[in-house]
Amino acid sequence: MTALTRILFPLPDYRRTPWTLLQWWEARRLTYNLFVGGAGVMSLAVMALVSSLPPGAPGLGFKWWGGVLIYGVAANVGYTMGWLTEVGMRVLWEEEAPLAGPALFRQGLSFAVGLTLLPVPLAIFSWVMRLVTHLF
């Protein structure tokens, strides 16, 4: 099994108490933050590069730090919702609750990384539009 497979398809928590579910989720938080943070660094780098290409546009400046901090907190609040969702399912359906942790983790990670990379095509589209308006 590859490292990526182990990350994306972890074994579920079979004990299923709120405490063990919390431990299961917290054991993966650093991995989640590394993936989302890496995507964020890549997005910022591409946006800085694209904004520096002619025809000119305002650069990123230092105003983006606040947005990065807010986004990081929001991403971790969203991550916490995975644990709360799984505990809620356990409370509602008791023993019949599905082992949803791995699927929730995968879906949440995919959504967060995708949302974090969304500025890349937007920045490229913005540059193409600047180029078109500059040429015509």
Predicted regions and their residues:
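Short alpha-helical packing/oligomerization segments
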Residues: 59-88
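Transmembrane alpha-helical segments of multi-pass membrane proteins
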Residues: 66-74, 100-117
